[in-house]
Amino acid sequence: MVGRKGGYIRAMAEFEAERGIPATAERVFAVVSDLDRLPEWLPAPVDVRPTGEGEVHADVPERGVDADGTVRVRPEQLRVEWAHAPEYAGWLQVEHAEGARSTVLLHLSFLGDQPETHGGTPAADVRQWLDDALARLERVVTTNA
């Protein structure tokens, strides 16, 4: 999606991945909402660490990203939201599924003139990263949550 604002073109790209996990939604949410556990399931090259109440620091050396952002954990919705305004935002939603299973939806939005907003390899890398993150999350949840 491309929009015009203030005389320049502002691009936007959104990515989403979904995965069924053989664990309850509460068990999955316990892992994703524990910000100290982010390194266990977020794949390289992304390194995100909590720095304070509602704050995180992200380091993505491949992209030259070294930035602070915000994070909001919403237990009543089984949802975690984060952002580095105005270029980036994301959320993870855990939903109940049949039996002792859950579904996890991971969404990322890139705004502005970032490589991901132009498609090609950077966009494919984001899609792969989403799939890898959900696969790692499943391993963490099912082996040692």
Q: Which stretches of residues belong to each language-model region?
A:
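Hydrophobic ligand-binding cavity/cleft-lining segments
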Residues: 2-52
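Hydrophobic-ligand-binding modules of eukaryotic lipid transfer/binding families
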Residues: 2-16, 68, 101-103, 125-131, ...
